[in-house]
């Protein structure tokens, strides 16, 4: 579990530094799950994205630029750049899985950087958004590869659990979620195809059944894109909160050393109020506040000004 720092400066007796902290995950959820899909497969566009959207989820799709056709008729097994942009416009993360899917640990320094850069440029040109996360082909990486891939990014997938194929029966998938809830962890699921590909399902309804299982636990689990969870957890770990007394409440000033453009994210502040209602403002705007048990959960900008809580 990550921690953030709260510093008191003459606080009132009503709210102490111990009462104020940054939640480990968005909205104070207990853990996080990211659903990721490799290799630009056509049914990511035709099946996976629509099934995620039916449940209010968004996924991360790792694209191999060299495999993506300009028009659908040229390749029926991979989605097009136009379809990728459509998925992005619907809220999914479309990110970098190298240009041609090589073993990155076997490349020269020049070829390594070219595989990353060429796909970054293609993604920006076709999607209109930069790739800020990375997925290693064949899950093969070393320290040099990680360093090259992480330049200008918030995260890379270094560990995953199987979403598809014989490696992921129902009991296995449910166990991954149970363990994440118990440990307060962020986990990332990985698969390629549903109906075709080396790790496809014998019965694709196993995938939608798992989505339904996640939906049933949504009050406890944050199902977020890889980029969103990576940015949130990095900023939550880095930020400090300075708590000072204010009229009828406190002022909480956030400070973080991370780049506000690359790591753009809202955070959730947990305030122990013993069940009392509060109002929160930042930079002249009212902030969203929700309640659960004895806590208030305040959505705030870690790159913004002081938060006043009354």
PLM regions and their residue ranges:
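C-terminal domain-boundary segment and adjacent tail
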Residues: 17-27, 53, 59, 63, ...
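N-terminal pre-catalytic segment of deacetylase/amide-hydrolase enzymes
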Residues: 11-35, 43-47, 76-79, 220-236, ...
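Bacterial N-terminal signal peptides
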Residues: 1-8
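Metal-dependent polysaccharide deacetylase catalytic core of the NodB/CE4 family, i.e.
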Residues: 31-33, 53-155, 159-164, 188-196
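Surface-exposed substrate-engagement region within the catalytic domains
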Residues: 148-151, 159, 166-181
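Non-membrane alpha-helical structural segments and their capping/turn regions in soluble enzymes
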Residues: 109-114, 170, 204, 208
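C-terminal beta-strand-rich structural cap/linker in extracellular carbohydrate-active enzymes
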Residues: 292-310
